[in-house]
């Protein structure tokens, strides 16, 4: 990929690719990034053990910044996860245990490390400073700098109240905690840039303002557009559920298929955001029409899957899509999965079959599916997926859960 030098306007590149919604000081930030390596942070509350494609825009933005020589920080909200960000939510989140939070932190860090190079000090937990600050101390350090009148004007809070949904004091204080996070990261790690979705604008502004009022460093904020697909669905979801970046939650094949099946209108935009192709090539692919646009969708699927799961997984998924589904569908409308008689004679099991075609991520995932009754041949549950398949499988329907069904076809 082409990486801009510090003398070039990195912000212009990010704007061209569609990463920028708002900046607290666009020209000041451009000059700050051009002046030398800066430290930027992206924060996640540890509400799940993986991230999904709705988070991918931030990961790619951080990747571009690191490629340009800047330092990434991953802030995990070990403390704020106990509260939950009320931004544009109608209800509070359930409270997690410490063990659940730690397991989620470990999972998020694994996903993050596939997109940026993490060092020993790249992962930060805000429990490091929030767990030790007393209530009265926090009010003195932070609370006195904020007006309730102004906080009530922020969209995230105002919309919640306008809908007459309850907003606890615990949640109301979240924005102050996030502002404090930014100031502490500036003080402890020299961090000067916070990244976030457009719904985080108020929280980011509060951090910038808090640093100014306390006489700290000049801080910057950059928000990304909140992504939705052209058919109106929130990015991160599919008809089958969340599109996770962790192979244990979603098989690489299904991840690849998500991108391959995207709306024609989204191809150019997604290539700019979720691949590292030069923009000239992005524009060429995005301008393709009709059947030729499928070429661009395959490029997108390969690029996104290679970043999330590695080149091998991307190739396996692409090969599976070509080999398994190349002949279209039978009268039933189900995809056809081909099996060679020679491979079957070698003792091929359902577990082997699903792994070889990258339809399931691991043997344990296949066994869990079978144990839950979700793996069936012509409607009959398969209790032991490791048993070699018999020759009578030709024409049978293989079901994985309630929504994924395939026809098996034997070939010489």
From Swiss-Prot:
Chain positions of motif 'HIGH' region: 46-55
Motif ('KMSKS' region): 234-238
Gene3D superfamilies registered for this protein in UniProt: HUPs (3.40.50.620), RNA-binding S4 domain (3.10.290.10), Tyrosyl-Transfer RNA Synthetase (1.10.240.10)
GO molecular function, one term: ATP binding
Keywords, comma-separated and alphabetical: Aminoacyl-tRNA synthetase, ATP-binding, Cytoplasm, Ligase, Nucleotide-binding, Protein biosynthesis, RNA-binding
Record-level GO cellular component terms: cytosol
Chief location of this protein within or outside the cell: cytoplasm
Catalytic activity from the UniProt record: tRNA(Tyr) + L-tyrosine + ATP = L-tyrosyl-tRNA(Tyr) + AMP + diphosphate + H(+)
Membrane-spanning intervals of the chain: none
Assembly mode: Homodimer.
Name the UniProt record assigns to this protein: Tyrosine--tRNA ligase 1
Organism of origin: Pseudomonas aeruginosa (strain ATCC 15692 / DSM 22644 / CIP 104116 / JCM 14847 / LMG 12228 / 1C / PRS 101 / PAO1)
Gene: tyrS1
